[in-house]
Structures are given as structure tokens and as C-alpha cells.
Design a protein with these regions (language model features):
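Entry/capping segment at the start of metal-dependent catalytic domains
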Residues: 1-31
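Acidic catalytic cores of enzymes that act on phosphate-bearing nucleotides/polynucleotides
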Residues: 185-188
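Active-site-proximal helix-loop-helix substrate-binding element of RNase H-like nuclease domains
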Residues: 32, 37, 41-183
Length: 188
């Protein structure tokens, strides 16, 4: 059995906190910006869809391969968003590390779970995420200064974009490391 840990970064004009993940991903302007993954114990790989990269065909095949378990922190979000974007994947093949953690009495939240089980600093979630999500994944107000644009794209701040890519990859590493700690305690 293969294992594929996944994290995506997305954007949509729909406020996910107010409307929920389904409405967010159903928006006409919904987009997956990047897709990071770790196959088994191989290094994390990043696919920057926003810059024209494509998910490797082998990985696309694994998304609906019953012999590959997909893992994510809040797996329902990744599953639904990937399906909305045309990558068909069966929910029964997914395992939610957040659910697994809370089932065991650990706190929810990738960072809090990692801290609670004491994972090494180089495996933890990066703290830069919220401001990067606000910059790239939430519409910006059009102003004279920003040329009237409603979205920030990678070329608007390459340094921030690079950090956002690192953040996405590190989320996969954090989820994978947490799962390695939790897998001895099966969820029925």
C-alpha cells in the first residue's frame, strides 16, 4: 500500500469562514495555486499550478488508486477541492490526520498538534502562513497603488511567493510527521 500526503494552497473570492469549503470551491474563480505532496517516505515535492506546472501523471493516477491512501490535515478540504478542479478521487481512500489527532484527544490545528506531540522544529508548520494566505489567496482591494488589481499574483512579490511555496511544502512535512506519530493508534 502506498501513502500520499497532500497539501494544497487555493484561492477564491468566496470567504471560506463565512460560506464554508463547498461554496468556496464552487466559486467560478476558485483556483488551486500549488500542490505539494510526499509519496511514502520520499522528499516533499511542489507543483506550482499557478505558474503552469502540472501534477505528474503518476501522482494524478494515484489520486484515484485504491492501493494508495491519501493523507491530509483536514482531508475533506483537499478531497473536495481536488474533485472540483477535475482530479477525481474517492473519499474512501482519504485519511484525515486532523480527525485522527482529535480522536486521540490532541488539539486541532496543524501547529497545535505538532507542538502537543513534540515534533522537531524542522518538521513543524511554519508561522508565516496566515499573512501569505491573506496576500495570495484572498482578493485584495483595488487601489491606484496596486494598479486596480483584485488579486496578488506571484510576480507581484516573488519573495513572498517563494515563502508561500515553502510554507505549502512544510505543511506536508508537518502532516506526514504527525501521522507517523499517530499511526500506531488506529482509528476504528
Amino acid at each position: 500500500m502506498q501513502h500520499l500526503s497532500i497539501d494544497i494552497e487555493t484561492r477564491s473570492s468566496v470567504n471560506i469562514a463565512k460560506s464554508g469549503a463547498y461554496k468556496y470551491a464552487q466559486s467560478e474563480d476558485f483556483e488551486i495555486l500549488m500542490f505539494s505532496y510526499k509519496l511514502n517516505d520520499l522528499p516533499v515535492q511542489l507543483v506550482v499550478l499557478k505558474q503552469g506546472e502540472k501534477i505528474p501523471p503518476y501522482i494524478v493516477g494515484l489520486l484515484n488508486d485504491e492501493n494508495c491512501i491519501k493523507h491530509a490535515y483536514n482531508a475533506a478540504f483537499e478531497w473536495y477541492c481536488l474533485n472540483q478542479a477535475g482530479y477525481k478521487t474517492n473519499i474512501s481512500q482519504w485519511r484525515c490526520t486532523m480527525f485522527h489527532a482529535t480522536y486521540l484527544g490532541l488539539p486541532a490545528g496543524l501547529s497545535m498538534t505538532g507542538n502537543a506531540i513534540g515534533i522537531a522544529d524542522d518538521k513543524k508548520k511554519l508561522t508565516t502562513g496566515n499573512r501569505l494566505i491573506q496576500f495570495f489567496s484572498v482578493p485584495c482591494k483595488p487601489t491606484k497603488t496596486n494598479g486596480g488589481r483584485t488579486w496578488n499574483d506571484p510576480y507581484h512579490d516573488l519573495d513572498k511567493w517563494k515563502l508561500y511555496c515553502e510554507y505549502n511544502m512544510q505543511d506536508v512535512e508537518a502532516e506526514y510527521t504527525i501521522y507517523q506519530h499517530l499511526k500506531a493508534f488506529e482509528v476504528p
